[in-house]
């Protein structure tokens, strides 16, 4: 995906909510039907949840107030099968949203402080609630059944038990870097205006700082001409990187010139290998080109891959990401809103199914998020106009030092479509029905995309 990051600071309406929003429609080949969740059951599940989570645990005095059944706030349309149930907790404070159908994960959102105000709901929260209402109702109409992982969550909550891995937590320490000075000191200026490093370059640099790799570049030269800047940029990757001089945090007046030069050099080199399109209002680059550049110029392993979330089930995707973090490997992650305003950042930890995000904004908004609710309350350099970064998510997997004998992992996708002459292709097909070893047969394909790191 192409990620362009502007310099505008966007403040979002703050919602006191821990991001715990799971994918709402998970497919399975089970023959069982999904069931509606009545308010009585939802209340018991809410009590169980507050009782088993350390940060929300309450005493015997806890009371739950049923404040919203998920109906449309504007039209007040009532329904016998609400999409979700909202409870405020008293007197301790906090609230919880329980799904109205077990096709979705049971706890859509919760907070251990504050309260849920239906009448004064911020517009961004209204949008979230409308989206989840539509998706749950759509799943009902399509007779979608819950996945095994979702059914397990319901069973555990009904028992008042924590998930098997609920206590496991991984958090890797990463630099709190940003896109402005001193990070962009070497980035080109356009008409006298500085350009930000770009979120792609910043994410790469944070990962390389964590790895303290490479010791120096591969020796190759990367040359390209950005269309907006208009002049050729070129870097020969043969200089050592001064990891000991790079600070984890750069505060005004608390660093010297050599420390600024060290991080600015790394940032600029990451930008050039990404073929960054520098611009004063936002610098952008393609993740695939950036990953390719890490291998070619920064001595990272050829087995690195770019994976799309839509290719996996929720359980598979979580397993893939957690395996990386368990191995001590950071994940270069990206997503956009429905306006295709994207951002690249770093996943550096997880707790249950929430992931710790380093947004590349100097520490602003860093914290745990559900991947289905990557919508920080405040944003820094590279923020979008709202709607979070939940669309088109992808991840660079296998970011590690080059290993001898490793090879590229090619990923070729065959697509359906019509040619200009009207011929229909349905991916990779053959008319052969019997396959005999060492006997040739014909396959047919019309459209394909190379999702791999290398060109071929």
Model-identified regions with their sequence ranges:
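Cys-His-centered catalytic/binding microenvironment captured across papain-like cysteine peptidases
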Residues: 37-73, 77-80, 96, 103-176, ...
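Surface-exposed patches in mature extracellular/periplasmic domains of secreted proteins
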Residues: 58-61, 213-224, 303-310
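Stable alpha-helical elements in mature extracytoplasmic
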Residues: 42, 195, 200-207, 290-294, ...
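Bacterial Sec-dependent N-terminal signal peptides
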Residues: 1-40, 269-272, 279-280, 294
